[in-house]
Every structure is written in C-alpha cells, then in structure tokens.
C-alpha cells in the first residue's frame, strides 16, 4: 500500500503535538497569511503564540485541569480520557520567508484563534549568487 501521508498531509510545514485537537486552516491573501485554529474553551491567557527561530509560528494551548472531587462517582469521563487529564496542544508551522514576523497579530473570538502574519512585499536583493568556474588546464 502506498504512503497515503503525502495525500493526507501535503504541507510538511506543519508539526503537531497534542493531547487534544487543535484544527487549523491556513489562508493567504495578497498581503498576509491568515491562520484560524479551533480553541474552544480556551481563554487568551491559556494560549501562547510565538515566532521561533527559523520563521516557525508556534501555537501552544494549556487548558486547566479539572480537580477530581471526592464523594463523586464518575460514570463517563471522555473529556479526561481524550485530553490526558488536561487540554494541551502545540502546533508549529514553518512560515514562508517573505513575512513580517515583527508585525504578527493574534486574537481569540468564539473559540477560534486567528493569527495574521503580514507579507513583506518590499523587493529584496536576490539570494542567487553566481559562482565563477575556473579550470586547472
């Protein structure tokens, strides 16, 4: 059977570690990259957005663990089982080179974190460099 990973995950720019699901959409406009991440139940204080070395957008969520109360009989504990006792996630996305990492904005509304990464539209010198070829003849 062929490796279906290429077809299921065509963008190898994504890294994910989670005890819960943090679904993500990545859209691109003429002037920015827009990321929308599902973070239901998280407050802005529970979420950390960082730009790491190498233009990597890091989004981490750490939910509050519920305390076990004495004198309670648990009949179903799906939220605990699927989240490992707390809701945590980490998503890393390798950003393109032409972005303004110092102007990234993020906000949470109705359980969705939106991160806007502006593009750098200024013309830059080419990273292509000619190399002289010599002969030993």
Curated annotation (Swiss-Prot):
Induction: By heat shock and methyl viologen (paraquat). GO terms for cellular component: peroxisomal matrix. The gene is HSP15.7. Possesses chaperone activity. One of its GO terms (biological process) is cellular response to hypoxia. Belongs to the small heat shock protein (HSP20) family. The keyword Ribosomal protein does not apply. Coiled coil: none annotated. A motif (Microbody targeting signal) lies at residues 135-137. Residues 15-134 form the sHSP domain. This is 15.7 kDa heat shock protein, peroxisomal. Pfam families: HSP20. It comes from the Eukaryota.
